[in-house]
C-alpha cells in the first residue's frame, strides 16, 4: 500500500484559496451588468417609454399649452401656427380678445372639470390674447376725446353679433406695436367656415387696410380688394353715403393725429 500524498492535496486546496482571494466582494458589488441593460426585455420598454414622454412633451408645448397673452407667443409660432379659442370681448370694430383653448373640445374645453366654463369679468385679466383682424380697417369709434366716424357703431355691433362668445381660429402673422396679434380669423357659421375680415368687407363694415407699413393679408389681398370694390358698387354699409362725405379710417387717423400734434 502506497503512502497518501498529503502534500499534493494541500497544494490543490492552496490553489483554490488563491483563486478565491483574487475576487473581492467589493469588486463583485461594483461591477456593472451591461447584459441586463441590453436585454430586449429591458431595452424595448425603456425606449418606448422615453419616446412617449418626449413626444408627449413636444405635443403639449407645441399644440396643447394654453397661451394667456400675446406676449407669451413664441416668435417661431408666427406664420406657422394658429390659435383656437373663444371670443370673450369685442372692444373695437376690427379687434377682439380671445381666450385660448388649445385642442378645443377634444382637449376637454367645455366639458372636462376645470375646463367646463371659461373665466368671466375680472377673472379674465391677463388671460386673453388681443387680436387685430388682418387686412381690414373698420371705422374708428370715439376714443381719447376724438369724435366717432360714421358707421363705427354699426361696424362694432356687426362684429359683436358675428363673433362674440363664439369659437374662432386665428392664423397669426405677427405682433404689432400695441401687442396685438395680427391674424386672419375664421369662424364657423352653421356648416361653413367664414373669413371674418372678408365678411366685414362684404357687408361694407370695413375697408381694405391702407397703411403702407405693417399691412398683413395672408394670401387674400386680391380677394379683399375685389370684395371691397363690389361693396362700394352696391353702396353697402359705410359706402351708402355721399362720396364727398366719405373719409377712410386711415385718413381719419392721419387727420386726427395731425390735429393733436398742433394742439401740443
UniProtKB/Swiss-Prot annotation:
Basic and acidic residues composition-biased segments:
10-20
- Tell me the InterPro entries matching this sequence: SNase_OB-fold_sf (IPR035437), Staphylococal_nuclease_OB-fold (IPR016071)
Q: How does it sit in the membrane?
A: Single-pass membrane protein
Molecular function as annotated in GO: endonuclease activity; metal ion binding
Span list, region Disordered: 1-21
Q: What is its EC number?
A: 3.1.-.-
Q: Name one Pfam family in it.
A: SNase
Q: Does the keyword Membrane apply?
A: yes
Q: Which GO terms describe its cellular component?
A: membrane; mitochondrion
| Residues of the active site | 132, 140, 180
Per UniProt, the keywords (alphabetical) are: Calcium, Endonuclease, Hydrolase, Membrane, Metal-binding, Mitochondrion, Nuclease, Transmembrane, Transmembrane helix
The region annotated as signal peptide is none
Instruction: Provide the protein's localization.
Output: Mitochondrion; Membrane
Which residues are noted in the entry as Ca(2+)-binding? Answer: 137
Q: Which residues cross the membrane?
A: 42-60
From the UniProt record, list the coiled-coil ranges.
Answer: none
Enzyme type, top EC level: hydrolase
Domain TNase-like spans what residues? 81-241
Q: Which coarse location class applies to the principal site listed for this UniProt protein?
A: mitochondrion
- Family under the similarity heading: Belongs to the LCL3 family.
Task: Give the protein name, as stated in the record.
Answer: Probable endonuclease lcl3
Q: What is the lineage of its organism?
A: Eukaryota, Fungi, Dikarya, Ascomycota, Pezizomycotina
> Gene for this protein?
lcl3
Amino acid at each position: 500500500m502506497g503512502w497518501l500524498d498529503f502534500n499534493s492535496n494541500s497544494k490543490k486546496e492552496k490553489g483554490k484559496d488563491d483563486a478565491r482571494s483574487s475576487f473581492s466582494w467589493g469588486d463583485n458589488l461594483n461591477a456593472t451588468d451591461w447584459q441586463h441593460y441590453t436585454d430586449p426585455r429591458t431595452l424595448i420598454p425603456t425606449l418606448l417609454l422615453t419616446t412617449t414622454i418626449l413626444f408627449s412633451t413636444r405635443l403639449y408645448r407645441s399644440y396643447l399649452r394654453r397661451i394667456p397673452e400675446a406676449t407669451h407667443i413664441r416668435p417661431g409660432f408666427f406664420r406657422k401656427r394658429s390659435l383656437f379659442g373663444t371670443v370673450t370681448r369685442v372692444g373695437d370694430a376690427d379687434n377682439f380678445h380671445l381666450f385660448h383653448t388649445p385642442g378645443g373640445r377634444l382637449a376637454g374645453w367645455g366639458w372636462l372639470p376645470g375646463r367646463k366654463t371659461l373665466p368671466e369679468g375680472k377673472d379674465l385679466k391677463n388671460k386673453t390674447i388681443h387680436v387685430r383682424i388682418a387686412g381690414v380697417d373698420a371705422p374708428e369709434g370715439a376714443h381719447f376725446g376724438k369724435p366717432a366716424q360714421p358707421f363705427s357703431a354699426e361696424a362694432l355691433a356687426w362684429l359683436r353679433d358675428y363673433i362674440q362668445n363664439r369659437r374662432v381660429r386665428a392664423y397669426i402673422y405677427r405682433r404689432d406695436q400695441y401687442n396685438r396679434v395680427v391674424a386672419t380669423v375664421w369662424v364657423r357659421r352653421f356648416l361653413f367656415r367664414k373669413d371674418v375680415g372678408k365678411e366685414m368687407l362684404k357687408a361694407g363694415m370695413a375697408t381694405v387696410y391702407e397703411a403702407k407699413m405693417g399691412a398683413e393679408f395672408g394670401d387674400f389681398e386680391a380677394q379683399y380688394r375685389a370684395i371691397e370694390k363690389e361693396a362700394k358698387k352696391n353702396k353697402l354699409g359705410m359706402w351708402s353715403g355721399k362720396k364727398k362725405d366719405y373719409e377712410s379710417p386711415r385718413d381719419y387717423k392721419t387727420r386726427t393725429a395731425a390735429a393733436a400734434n398742433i394742439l401740443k
